[in-house]
């Protein structure tokens, strides 16, 4: 039924017309309607299936305590508790009864060597040992002193014929000898010079004058005429028979000493003599003259800064001039004038350029020691006074500290044997000590039997002259002999005349530094230096000032597309549009994007256990494993059966040397041995008794010239000659090698302040050095102030369509639907996460035993196993046959001392022994108080000025000093000091405060200025001990002017430690 309502009279908007009649067929389905509102809750559904059991819940909170139960039965005793800590020691119990002696213990290991015992008494002289083998020839000994005059030796054999000597001086006429038998007539000689007429002979019987007949027989010898002049010597006649020995003539008068011979050439340097015994200390020598100034030492390291001095008065500021050119070195100044009153210290000026070192001034004389008190101005030096009389000797000082050990004296005589002490307890044998020093030579053994004659010895030294023989026949003149050995010292000669002035002497040793010279004139401008090396990276600079704003940059490339902007605010709802006509059916839309992966499913049940697989193929042999640890010793195995008797073994190696057996009985005398080699030449026997006087032998021919004799001992020192004229000064010697660094001298007195140098000209600018490396990037600067806002940019282009938005949040869960029918099986899901490991399955059956693999390489040998327990002794084997005799073993070592027996009962007291020898001198007593100072010595004459030393290198400017600074030396400047052990890299320094710093050594000057020198410590190495030695770094201390009764000097060395 339709109804119609007329709304024409309504004044509202037009309403839709009435619905038309139903069309002939149903229309196509319309679009889905909007989701309806939520319906009311349905009735509860059927019970679902039981869920799987949930995880166990957390433990509940602890319940309230229940009421106390009734008392239980007594429990069983508990196990023993752990051992408690040791209690305090109880009181000492009474001594127990002595136990029985225990069994002797095993022999102990040798203990460490004990300290050396005191030296025992010398033993009795042993019996003479058998003669040792001939030793090698020793080195030639030192020349011995002259021996006693020997007996006259027998005449020597005739020497070789010497060359014809020069004609000798005419000899004194000898006594006429007895007439010899007539010789056979010689050939006629050349006619001699006419002799002076002889005495008239007896008149002969007048003969008949006839022709000259042959020479008649020789007539009787006439009386000898007077001596003619000496003819030239004839050739030597045959040797006559020896005449009877004449009586010795009386000793001639000692001749006057001959003139002094020319000085011989310097002999070859002798072998160094053995060290003589230490002589007694000589008397103290006179003080030496002061030496020349030493070369400058190298610059010392920077000293520790001194305490800050009081500020000085402000000096006037000078204008900084340019550096002046160097002045020539000034001439040495004359005597130092009196020092002015010291002004207050000005502030340190800027360091000037180093001037050349001035020549050392002439050395002033040391002033006499003034009384203590404030230092007055030194007065001018007075002239030297005359030498005063020698003062009376001072009191003897107390005994000084013990001197160094002297050389060991000769062994004293053997004292009498003292009474035997009680036996000591047995010590364990010590390990073998080091080889002892060679023992003293024993006393001379009994002489052996005479050996066969030795080979001929070398030619002996020339013997001393025998007693004067009777004059022999005149021999031919020999050649001039070599100079004989030097004679004994002659008597002390008279002082010689004054010598001529000496030549230039060698330059003397460098002396002590002179006083500080006056400041030199400024030095010349130096040459331009080379460009310096590249400097190290500088420290980052401070932040620079803010830079000016830069120019506007070009526009950059367009940026990447920005993310989709957030949605705008919801616009105002528009008016509802008219309902459109139904559209055509749209095409099926594309499938939606895949959803996000769901969470992983729960772990699946573990799968059933698979069957055992087939045995795999045999693997390769593995690499040898490392050696296993040493296994524990296995249990002792049972004794094996006794083996059969072995074959006779070969002779074993010689066994270790056994302990020496007891001495055997004396054997029968052996058969005579073969003659030994000739023994060495025996010592010279004692002088025999003097033989009967022999007959005078014939004069031998002159012997060969003897070797030059050894120089005789030097004669006594002659009295000094008169002083020679002073030689002119020598040229300066070449510069010597740089000496080892000298010790730091005591600081000199402060010199007067020098005048300021003229300002030097400014140097040329140096070359530009290479640019340094780029420095490390500095730290970022502070952020600048915010910039001005920029102009607004142009509007951007329309963005492309954004990506799909993230899925919205899950809606609230709908009500539970009915259980659907089972769906088709889905595709297999992704593999689940691995399940929890299943329980361990039962062990599989043992596989077949694999084939033996190839033997692996031998592993490294494991450490030796623990020594197993000794097996039971085997059955005793049959006795072997006797082996062949081995070589005679070496003499066995001395057996160990047997174990100490129990102490015997005390013997009766012996008689009191004789008094022992006086003990060694006691230690030197403490030093006595210093004696009164001696008078001042005379002033020495002024020495000649030394040659100027080479200018030393300019040192680095030192730190401003207050008083004196004691600057430590750099450890390694030139060659290493051989006496410096490991360098003192680390000395332990005691703690100190800023006000009173710790000092390793405190030295004070004579003006009460402390010289401080503290080592810094980089590491305390006292915990390690390297065994190397070191010395304290105190090189030399020369305390001066200590000796008044209230003065003392000492150095206290605290704990030090060397690495």
Curated annotation (Swiss-Prot):
It is found in: Secreted, Extracellular space, Extracellular matrix. This is Collagen, type I, alpha 1b. Pfam families: COLFI, Collagen. Residues 1026-1059 form the Fibrillar collagen NC1 domain. It comes from the Eukaryota. The keyword Methyltransferase does not apply. Residues 13-27, 130-142, 945-960 have a biased composition (Pro residues). GO terms for cellular component: collagen trimer; extracellular matrix; extracellular space. It comes from Epinephelus caninus. Residues 1-997 are annotated as: Disordered. Residues 47-61, 876-889 have a biased composition (Basic and acidic residues). The keyword Lipid metabolism does not apply. Keywords: Collagen, Extracellular matrix, Secreted. Residues 143-162, 294-306, 469-478, 499-508, 532-541, 622-631, 646-655 have a biased composition (Gly residues). Its main location: secreted. InterPro entries: Collagen (IPR008160), Collagen_superfamily (IPR050149), Fib_collagen_C (IPR000885).
């Amino acid at each position: 039924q339709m109804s119609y309502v007329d709304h024409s009279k309504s004044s509202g908007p037009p309403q839709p017309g009435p619905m038309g009649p139903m069309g002939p067929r149903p229309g196509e389905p319309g679009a889905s309607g909007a989701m309806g509102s939520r319906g009311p809750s349905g009735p509860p559904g059927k019970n679902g299936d039981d869920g799987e059991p949930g995880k166990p819940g957390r433990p509940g909170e602890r319940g309230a305590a229940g009421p106390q139960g009734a008392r239980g039965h007594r429990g069983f005793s508990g196990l023993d508790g752990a051992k408690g800590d040791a209690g305090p020691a109880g009181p000492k119990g009474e001594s127990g009864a002595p136990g029985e002696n225990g069994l002797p213990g095993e022999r102990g290991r040798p203990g460490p060597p004990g300290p050396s015992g005191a030296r025992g008494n010398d033993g009795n002289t042993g019996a003479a040992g058998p003669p040792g083998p001939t030793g090698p020839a020793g080195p030639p000994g030192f020349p011995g002193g002259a021996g006693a005059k020997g007996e006259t030796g027998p005449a020597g054999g005739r020497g070789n014929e010497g060359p014809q000597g020069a004609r000798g001086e005419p000899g004194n006429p000898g006594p006429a000898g007895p007439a010899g038998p007539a010789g056979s007539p010689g050939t006629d000689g050349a006619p001699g010079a006419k002799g002076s007429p002889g005495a008239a002979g007896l008149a002969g019987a007048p003969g008949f004058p006839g022709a000259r007949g042959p020479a008649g027989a020789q007539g009787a010898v006439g009386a000898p005429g007077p001596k003619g002049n000496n003819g030239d010597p004839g050739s030597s006649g045959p040797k006559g028979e020896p005449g009877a020995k004449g009586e010795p003539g009386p000793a001639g008068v000692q001749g006057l000493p001959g003139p002094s011979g020319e000085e011989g050439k310097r002999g070859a340097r002798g072998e160094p003599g053995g060290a003589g015994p230490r002589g007694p200390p000589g008397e103290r020598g006179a003080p030496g003259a002061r030496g020349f100034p030493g070369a400058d030492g190298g610059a010392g390291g920077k000293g520790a800064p001194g305490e800050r001095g009081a500020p000085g008065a402000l000096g006037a500021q000078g204008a900084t001039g340019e550096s002046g050119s160097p002045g020539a070195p000034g001439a040495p100044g004359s005597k130092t004038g009196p020092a002015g009153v010291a002004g207050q210290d000005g502030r340190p000026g800027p360091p000037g350029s180093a001037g050349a070192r001035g020549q050392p001034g002439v050395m002033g004389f040391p002033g006499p020691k003034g009384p203590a008190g404030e230092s007055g101005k030194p007065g001018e030096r007075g002239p030297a006074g005359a030498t005063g009389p020698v003062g009376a000797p001072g009191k003897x000082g107390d005994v000084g500290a013990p001197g160094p050990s002297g050389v060991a004296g000769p062994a004293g005589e053997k004292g009498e044997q003292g009474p035997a002490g009680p036996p000591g307890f047995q010590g364990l044998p010590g390990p073998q000590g080091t080889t002892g020093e060679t023992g003293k030579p024993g006393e001379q053994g009994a002489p052996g039997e005479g050996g066969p004659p030795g080979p001929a010895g070398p030619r002996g030294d020339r013997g001393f002259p025998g007693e004067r023989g009777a004059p022999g026949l005149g021999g031919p003149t020999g050649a001039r002999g070599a100079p004989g050995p030097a004679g004994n010292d002659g008597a002390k000669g008279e002082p010689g005349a004054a010598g001529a002035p000496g030549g230039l002497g060698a330059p003397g040793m460098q002396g002590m530094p002179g006083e500080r010279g006056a400041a030199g004139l400024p030095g010349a401008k130096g040459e331009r230096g080379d460009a310096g090396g590249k400097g190290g990276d500088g420290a980052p600079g401070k932040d620079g000032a803010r830079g000016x704003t830069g120019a506007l940059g070009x526009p950059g490339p367009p940026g990447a597309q920005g993310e989709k902007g957030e949605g705008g605010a919801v616009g105002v709802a528009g008016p509802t549009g008219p309902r459109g006509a139904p559209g055509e059916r749209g095409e099926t839309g594309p499938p939606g994007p895949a959803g996000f992966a769901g969470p992983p499913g729960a772990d699946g049940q573990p799968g059933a256990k698979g069957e055992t697989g087939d045995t795999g193929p045999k693997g390769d042999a593995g690499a040898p494993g490392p050696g296993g640890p040493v296994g524990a010793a296995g249990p002792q195995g049972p004794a094996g059966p006794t083996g059969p008797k072995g074959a006779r073994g070969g002779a074993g190696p010689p066994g270790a040397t056994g302990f020496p057996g007891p001495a055997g009985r004396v054997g029968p005398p052996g058969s005579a041995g073969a003659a030994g080699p000739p023994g060495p030449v025996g010592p010279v026997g004692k002088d025999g008794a003097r033989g009967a006087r022999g007959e005078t032998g014939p004069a031998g021919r002159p012997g060969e010239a003897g070797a030059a004799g050894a120089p005789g001992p030097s004669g006594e020192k002659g009295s000094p000659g008169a002083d020679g004229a002073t030689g002119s000064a020598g040229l300066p010697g070449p510069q010597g090698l740089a000496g080892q660094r000298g010790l730091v001298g005591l600081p000199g007195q402060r010199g007067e302040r020098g005048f300021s140098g003229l300002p030097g000209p400014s140097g040329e600018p140096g070359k530009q050095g290479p640019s340094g490396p780029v420095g490390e990037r500095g730290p970022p600067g502070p952020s600048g102030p915010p910039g001005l806002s920029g102009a607004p940019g142009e509007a951007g282009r329309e963005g492309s369509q954004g990506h799909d938005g993230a899925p919205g949040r899950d809606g609230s869960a709908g009500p539970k639907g009915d259980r659907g029918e089972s769906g088709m099986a889905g595709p297999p899901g992704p593999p689940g996460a691995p399940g929890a490991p299943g329980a361990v399955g039962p062990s599989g059956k043992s596989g077949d035993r694999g084939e033996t693999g190839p033997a692996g390489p031998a592993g490294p040998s494991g450490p030796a196993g623990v020594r197993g327990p000794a097996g039971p002794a085997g059955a005793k084997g049959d006795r072997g046959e006797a082996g062949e005799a081995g070589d005679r073993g070496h003499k066995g070592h001395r057996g160990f001392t047997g174990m100490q027996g129990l102490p015997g009962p005390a013997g009766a007291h012996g008689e009191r022994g004789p008094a022992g020898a006086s003990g060694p001198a006691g230690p030197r007593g403490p030093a006595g108080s210093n004696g009164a100072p001696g008078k001042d010595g005379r002033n020495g004459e002024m020495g000649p000025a030394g040659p100027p030393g080479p200018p030393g290198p300019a040192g680095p400017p030192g730190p401003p000093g207050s008083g004196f600074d004691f600057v430590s030396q750099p450890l390694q400047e030139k060659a290493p000091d051989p006496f410096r052990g490991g360098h003192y890299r680390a000395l332990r320094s005691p703690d100190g405060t800023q006000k009173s710093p710790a000092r390793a050594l405190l030295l004070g000057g004579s003006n009460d200025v402390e010289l401080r020198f503290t080592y810094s410590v980089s590491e305390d190495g006292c915990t390690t001990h390297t065994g190397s030695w070191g010395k304290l770094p105190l090189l030399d201390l020369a305390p001066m002017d200590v000796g008044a009764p209230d003065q003392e000097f000492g150095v206290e060395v605290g704990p030090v430690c060397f690495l």
